[in-house]
């Protein structure tokens, strides 16, 4: 069924039911109770819980899955696989919905697993001990309260599209990256984020294989802080070594756990 402007109640029946918002020129926010808010005063739909198996958003708009109003349920969201699973539902347990063309996620008050896509995602865990992974693309990652893990795989958060963790809480949060380290070496400041400037500071002698380093850019209130994780070759390699912005972190960088 094709969605439109206005506030509608949508339900399915036997078989695979699809609600298609691809023709609706609005940003969507899908939240607890099957509520689908459409930006621009286009109304709010109510989608009958779990009668609908597939929700298609407009790929040219910014669309969000919002679990922040939930009190008991937790979320498993994988935007790369277009899959939303809601856990701890009364009388049901878990239920899954295919969600296409969503870029952003706000987690619940519980322990969520949130995985982004190759787009630029804005992923927020909310309360609870969350596992958050942005995949490729320049992602904004927010853990919220709880002991959160930010997970990065090979090819994620490189120089040409690095991620930003907005609220890294050292001592509570940890980073699951290419290297395991219980210490981060401070390399001072860099003049720019060009590969050439980074290679001068993170050179073959100082930035050894499997090393974790921190450095800053700018000064005063404009100072930004970054982590660099070397994969297995000395010196900074823009196409291989991970770089993560952690401006605004709390705690002592020397205590950061990278697992």
Residue ranges and their predicted role:
Residues 30, 77, 186-189, 209-214, ...:
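Generic structural motif
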Residues 1-74, 81-83, 94-96, 111-197:
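Acidic, glycine-rich calcium-binding repeat modules characteristic of RTX/beta-roll
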Residues 32-34, 80, 85-87, 147-153, ...:
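Right-handed beta-helix
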Residues 47-48, 53, 63-64, 93-104, ...:
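Low-complexity acidic/polar repeat-biased segments
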């Amino acid at each position: 069924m094709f969605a439109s402007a206005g506030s509608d109640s949508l339900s399915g029946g036997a078989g695979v039911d699809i609600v298609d918002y691809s023709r609706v020129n609005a940003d969507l926010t899908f939240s607890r109770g099957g509520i689908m808010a459409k930006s621009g005063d286009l109304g709010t739909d109510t989608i009958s819980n779990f009668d609908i198996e597939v929700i298609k958003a407009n790929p040219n708009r910014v669309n969000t899955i919002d679990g922040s109003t939930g009190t008991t349920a937790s979320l498993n969201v994988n935007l790369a696989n277009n899959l939303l699973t809601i856990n701890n539902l009364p009388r049901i347990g878990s239920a899954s919905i295919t969600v296409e063309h969503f870029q952003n996620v706000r987690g619940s008050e519980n322990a969520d697993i949130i995985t982004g896509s190759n787009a630029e995602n804005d992923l927020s865990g909310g309360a609870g001990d969350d596992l958050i992974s942005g995949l490729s693309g320049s992602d904004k990652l927010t853990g919220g309260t709880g002991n959160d893990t930010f997970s990065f795989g090979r090819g994620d958060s490189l120089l040409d599209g690095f991620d930003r963790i907005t609220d890294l809480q050292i001592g509570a949060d940890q980073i699951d990256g290419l290297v395991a380290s219980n210490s981060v070496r401070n390399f001072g400041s860099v003049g720019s984020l060009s590969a050439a400037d980074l290679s001068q500071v993170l050179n073959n002698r100082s930035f050894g294989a499997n090393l974790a380093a921190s450095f800053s850019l700018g000064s005063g209130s404009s100072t930004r802080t970054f982590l660099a994780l070397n994969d297995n070759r000395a010196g900074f390699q823009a196409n291989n070594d991970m770089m993560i912005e952690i401006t605004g972190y709390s705690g002592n960088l020397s205590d950061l756990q990278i697992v």
